[in-house]
């Protein structure tokens, strides 16, 4: 069975290490760790296909801006006939603490425009991995916060490594095992922003 891992972000060098691009950062790290081939541009996304253990996986980074992420993802899903239960979207989340991971299927989009775009075209019944980027300090604009770079990139990279270490658990029926493994690892990591 084919699985689709999607990272949300904005294309362009100026966005590379911004909080809003943590989804892209996760997909890039997965690609390098599991030796996927280089990305190719198809369906208005950067795509790479490979395997994680015995699971066939497509990695995708929509090459539209965040607000239009749904169109390329919908195109990939329809072409490869990927069931919604096999789609996992990695994205930034301002409503949870820095470097905290939450996983859920369906639900609202909490104002996240990338998720809104996907929901409009595919519905909400896919998996989301929410990567906490923290809420901006008093007086800081939310758009400035999400489009600025991380203060503690080391903590971000450690959290991404924890995700990769247990990523094959995401392909199992009980995704709570992944959540608990990653949560336990993060608990012992310095994640001060």
From Swiss-Prot:
This entry's Enzyme Commission designation comes to 3.1.1.29
Q: Site Stabilizes the basic form of H active site to accept a proton: which residues? A: 92
What PROSITE patterns does the annotation carry?
PEPT_TRNA_HYDROL_1, PEPT_TRNA_HYDROL_2
**GO MF terms, alphabetically ordered:** peptidyl-tRNA hydrolase activity; tRNA binding
Positions the record marks as coiled coil are none
Q: What are the UniProt keywords, alphabetically? A: Cytoplasm, Hydrolase, RNA-binding, tRNA-binding
Q: Which residues bind tRNA?
A: 15, 65, 67, 113
Pfam family membership, one: Pept_tRNA_hydro
Q: Which GO terms describe its biological process?
A: protein quality control for misfolded or incompletely synthesized proteins; rescue of stalled ribosome
Keyword match Hydrolase: yes
Give me the Gene Ontology terms describing cellular component: cytoplasm
Query: Domain of life of the organism in this record?
Result: Bacteria
Annotated compartments? Cytoplasm
Disulfide pairings: none
- Show the catalytic activity: an N-acyl-L-alpha-aminoacyl-tRNA + H2O = an N-acyl-L-amino acid + a tRNA + H(+)
Q: Where is the active site?
A: 20 (proton acceptor)
The protein's site described by Discriminates between blocked and unblocked aminoacyl-tRNA is found at 10
Please give the subunit comment from the record. Answer: Monomer.
User: What function does the entry list?
Assistant: Hydrolyzes ribosome-free peptidyl-tRNAs (with 1 or more amino acids incorporated), which drop off the ribosome during protein synthesis, or as a result of ribosome stalling. Catalyzes the release of premature peptidyl moieties from peptidyl-tRNA molecules trapped in stalled 50S ribosomal subunits, and thus maintains levels of free tRNAs and 50S ribosomes.
For this entry, the protein name equals: Peptidyl-tRNA hydrolase
Q: Which gene encodes it?
A: pth
């Amino acid at each position: 069975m084919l699985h689709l891992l999607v990272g949300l972000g904005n294309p362009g060098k100026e966005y590379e290490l911004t909080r809003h691009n943590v989804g892209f950062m996760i997909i890039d790290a997965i690609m390098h760790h599991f030796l996927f081939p280089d990305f190719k541009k198809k369906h208005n996304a950067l795509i790479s296909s490979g395997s994680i253990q015995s699971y066939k996986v497509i990695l995708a980074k929509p090459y539209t801006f965040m607000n239009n992420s749904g169109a390329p993802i919908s195109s990939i899903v329809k072409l490869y006939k990927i069931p919604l239960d096999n789609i996992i979207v990695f994205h930034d989340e301002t409503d949870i603490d820095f470097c905290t991971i939450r996983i859920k299927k369906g639900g609202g989009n909490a104002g996240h425009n990338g998720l809104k775009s996907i929901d409009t075209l595919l519905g909400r019944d896919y998996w989301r991995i929410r990567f906490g980027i923290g809420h901006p300090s008093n007086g800081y604009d939310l758009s400035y916060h999400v489009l600025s770079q991380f203060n503690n990139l080391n903590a971000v990279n450690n959290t991404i490594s924890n995700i990769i270490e247990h990523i094959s658990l995401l392909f199992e029926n009980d995704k709570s095992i992944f959540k608990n493994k990653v949560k336990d690892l993060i608990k012992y990591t310095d994640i001060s922003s």
